[in-house]
Amino acid sequence: MGGAQVLLLLTLLGTPLVTHGTPPLVVDPSIGSQLGLGSVLGLDLGSMGGSGRPPCRPINVTVAVEKEECPQCMAVTTTACGGYCRTREPVYRSPLGPPPQSSCTYGALRYERWDLWGCPIGSDPKVILPVALSCRCARCPIATSDCTVQGLGPAFCGAPGGFGGQ
């Protein structure tokens, strides 16, 4: 392996993979031609999203809605964002920290109001839920979303009466 090829290989190993758009072109001086990054590394970058994995999109979900002052949960069917987004896992530790990861989150949304059953007189039975109109892959907005690896799940009901009065 010549010096230029070793330098090219070291440069490629230290370069993070492209996660969107057209792969950059790399010129190999020993060949004198342009090669796509995927060709040099022997990867098919077009299929890294994984065939068979559903993309980020609005999906119908049933969630448990509850309020602290109301004794029961109510199952509500709404639209949320779900599916896969392309992520990167570094092969080396960077002093800059890990690369930002994207998750499937709301692009556009509207809000719907639901009234819970069995709430005591004088309490507010109204609950407002977001409804996904469109979704996108972006950094998880931790101020408004559950960005944990595995949350409680949409059907979790912590009310003492469980699901009642449907």
From Swiss-Prot:
Disulfide bonds join 56-104, 70-119, 73-157, 81-135, 85-137, 140-147. InterPro entries: Cystine-knot_cytokine, Glyco_hormone_CN, Gonadotropin_bsu, Gonadotropin_bsu_CS. It comes from the Eukaryota. Residues 1-21 form the signal peptide. Glycans are attached at residue 60. GO terms for molecular function: hormone activity. Pfam families: Cys_knot. PANTHER family: GLYCOPROTEIN HORMONE BETA CHAIN, LUTROPIN SUBUNIT BETA. This is Lutropin subunit beta. It comes from Coturnix japonica (Japanese quail).
